[in-house]
Amino acid sequence: MGGGTSPEAQQDSVMRTDSSEMTDVESVITSFASSARAGRRNALPDIQSSLATSGSSDLPLKLEALAVKEDAKTKNEEKDQGQPKTPLNEGK
């Protein structure tokens, strides 16, 4: 093996890292750890804004409104079923 570097020396140089790169990684890890987030699961409060108008306290009212609308729709369908439909040309 002539004038080149050995494969072991090349591998050693690849395995070494620059100390400034490690410092950057450590600062990111430290800031992530101090944010009290454990990943995507806890990211939801970060993306919700204060402009969000609905919350869990509004849910019973919204469900009640849906139930009322559904009841009215059912009553209208029952009325329609009780009355025979007349063809358009019979009334003339």
From Swiss-Prot:
Single GO term (MF): cAMP-dependent protein kinase inhibitor activity
Residue numbers bearing the Phosphoserine modification: S56
Coiled coil: none
Protein's UniProt name: cAMP-dependent protein kinase inhibitor beta
UniProt family annotation: Belongs to the PKI family.
Keyword check for Phosphoprotein: yes
Residues of the site described as Important for inhibition: R37, R40, R41
InterPro entries: cAMP_dep_PKI
GN (gene name): Pkib
Species, as recorded: Mus musculus
Entry superkingdom: Eukaryota
Chain's role: Extremely potent competitive inhibitor of cAMP-dependent protein kinase activity, this protein interacts with the catalytic subunit of the enzyme after the cAMP-induced dissociation of its regulatory chains.
Pfam families linked: PKI
Biased composition annotated in UniProt, kind: Basic and acidic residues: 70-82
Polar residues bias locations: 7-26
